[in-house]
């Protein structure tokens, strides 16, 4: 009852004749809640990211600043999360890696500037040789309330 699939090498498709299986799903192909999602009794707004510079060398650092505002009616705490994506690495890298987070408690209507410092240490990854190193190139950073944020900026690491 096993048929060999064309073009898949040693992969086999199992075809059970006593069951019906549809491969069509009419649901979104995404998690119900993104990583870092949290409930709150109030709402928050996060400004666009402002970088103090658009490039750094291996001994430097970049400061990424956002303003978070409590737009609700209750005092609340928001966890801002910093994700980094290496656009073109020599090995496959995650789409977004959580590198830092900061908790901010705000009263209704209050806003606060939050600064994340990015160093080469946060850009290191394990190479095929088993060594942690960074590579020159372009990086994207995302700052928001969870991993699905579209709030991004980019910078270049020069070596």
Identify the meaning behind each predicted range.
Residues 1-12:
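Single conserved hydrophobic/aromatic residue that forms the stacking wall/gate
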Residues 10-159:
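Intrinsically disordered, low-complexity Ser/Thr/Gly-rich stretches
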């Amino acid at each position: 009852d096993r048929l060999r699939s064309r073009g898949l090498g040693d992969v086999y498709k199992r075809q059970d004749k006593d069951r019906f299986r549809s491969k069509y799903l009419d649901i979104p192909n995404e998690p119900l809640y993104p990583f870092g999602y949290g409930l709150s009794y109030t709402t928050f707004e996060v400004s666009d990211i402002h970088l103090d510079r658009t490039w750094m060398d291996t001994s430097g650092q970049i400061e990424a600043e956002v303003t978070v505002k409590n737009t609700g009616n209750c005092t609340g705490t928001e966890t801002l999360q910093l994700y980094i994506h290496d656009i073109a690495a020599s090995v496959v890298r995650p789409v977004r890696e959580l590198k830092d987070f900061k908790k901010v408690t705000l009263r209704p209507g209050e806003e606060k500037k939050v600064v994340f410092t990015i160093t080469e240490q946060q850009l290191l990854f394990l190479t095929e040789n088993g060594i942690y190193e960074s590579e020159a190139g372009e990086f994207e950073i995302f700052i928001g309330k969870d991993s699905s944020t579209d709030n991004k900026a980019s910078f270049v690491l020069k070596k």
